[in-house]
């Protein structure tokens, strides 16, 4: 009797093209696939890889975060590159003059960048200006900022766990006893 071979590890799963059927995204992929092949720069390879990514792995980045990353004196005339969405941040009042390249920019963020005398360019334009990523600052949003990520980790309730419990209801009887009141063990 033969043995069954486990084929679980036979192939390395990685995206070689975007799952999306968006023709504009696929055109961008064509451009950056060419650049990744022909230029000897890591920048184009990273952009290409990120264009393939799922929405979960392309989290939005706030305007405040972009401003903070571009604050350094050495990054004065650089282009901020985001493979994803730039969103507005009401907590920041004044934004500097920025040159930004992103897949999407929300309406308010777009208005604020342009009002500050900034410039918004597309990835096609970026490929013309800087095919090797010269004078660019590549940035991305926090992937662990999602609500779902708070529930990952060691089980809620075990020592030193900061995992958020999955609660079906926020009523009096749910996750409100031990550790939440003095009369039930301890109050944290």
Swiss-Prot record:
Gene3D superfamilies: 3.100.10.10. One of its GO terms (molecular function) is RNA binding. It is found in: Cytoplasm. It comes from the Eukaryota. Keywords: Cytoplasm, Ribonucleoprotein, Ribosomal protein. Residues 161-171, 178-188 have a biased composition (Basic residues). It comes from Lysiphlebus testaceipes (Greenbugs aphid parastoid). One of its GO terms (biological process) is translation. Belongs to the eukaryotic ribosomal protein eL18 family. This is Large ribosomal subunit protein eL18. Residues 151-188 are annotated as: Disordered.
